[in-house]
């Protein structure tokens, strides 16, 4: 079981080397991350984008493009389509976003002709290495689904569980976190949490243990759980935090990064291959970890 993000680099190296297809690769932070991943032996890369800019960035930043295939395409919409096409044709295993809008890339991924549209919902899964926590902490969904209903949360959980399984966490503990840890008919998030827990107990959601509603405090602190008299397999030992909406996930994730000094990695799940998105605000390590995470999952 992977307990620290730095361990996923070695895990990725032990697995079969994958090929990453980068859409609109003419972006300095993305090129730096991809070159580092190639140097580390995690991936080979296909760069789709403005070749002149790609080569110029590499020269200015002393980046070794080595044997990477570069496909010259200045139009970002066409670059996204070509990057996706490489995966559809089996020439690459997964996709990374470069210098283009997320919606542009996902439109290409979900194009019916591309063949990468999955059967379910796209959701964002972040993995945090928090110094104050005893293992990796997964957070979902703070990036894709604004206000998920119960049926959406089932798919969001399943997507996160797939990521946990890829990191050799066999039976991840899922905490649907809410403002309170009791079912309140006036608070939909608590009703959804209770339903998810019951569905898990009856085998409708497999591969994990779900217990909720739980407050954030008792989801990650056994002392807080004991103080409130909560007896739970998940309390104080959560692997996956399921947030009620995108705002909660966004705020919590950024709090872990900026106040908790956490390092992170993230992917979009739900298509036939993972999609790696990195923020300009991410550290170089986080970008590298995201590429490694995508390689392990794909």
Question: What does each of the following model-derived ranges do?
Answer:
Residues 1-47, 51-234, 239-243, 248-298:
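Anion-binding alpha/beta catalytic cores of soluble intermediary-metabolism enzymes, centered on
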């Amino acid at each position: 079981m992977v307990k620290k993000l730095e361990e996923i680099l070695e895990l990725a190296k032990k697995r079969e080397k994958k090929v990453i297809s980068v859409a609109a690769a003419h972006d300095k932070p993305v090129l730096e991350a991809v070159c580092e991943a190639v140097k580390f032996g995690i991936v080979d890369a296909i760069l789709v984008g403005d070749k002149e800019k790609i080569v110029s960035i590499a020269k200015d930043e002393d980046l070794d493009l080595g044997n990477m295939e570069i496909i010259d395409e200045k139009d970002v919409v066409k670059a996204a389509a070509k990057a996706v096409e490489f995966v559809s044709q089996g020439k690459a295993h997964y996709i990374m976003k470069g210098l283009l809008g997320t919606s542009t890339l996902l439109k290409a991924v979900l194009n019916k002709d591309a063949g990468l549209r999955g059967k379910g919902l796209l959701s964002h899964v972040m993995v945090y290495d928090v110094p104050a926590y005893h293992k990796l902490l997964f957070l979902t969904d703070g990036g894709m689904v604004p206000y998920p209903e119960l049926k959406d949360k089932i798919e969001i959980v399943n997507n996160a569980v797939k990521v946990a399984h890829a990191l050799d966490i066999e039976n991840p503990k899922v905490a649907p976190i809410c403002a309170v840890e009791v079912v309140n008919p006036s608070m939909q998030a608590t009703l959804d949490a209770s339903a998810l827990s019951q569905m898990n107990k009856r085998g409708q959601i497999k591969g994990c243990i779900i217990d909720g509603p739980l407050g954030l405090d008792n989801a990650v602190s056994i002392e807080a759980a004991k103080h409130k008299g909560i007896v739970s397999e998940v309390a104080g030992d959560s692997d996956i935090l399921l947030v009620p909406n995108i705002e909660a996930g966004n705020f919590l994730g950024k709090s872990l990064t900026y106040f908790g000094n956490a390092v992170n990695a993230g992917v979009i799940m739900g298509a036939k291959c993972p999609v790696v998105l990195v923020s300009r605000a991410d550290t170089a390590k986080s970008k590298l970890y995201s590429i490694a995470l995508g390689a392990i999952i794909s």
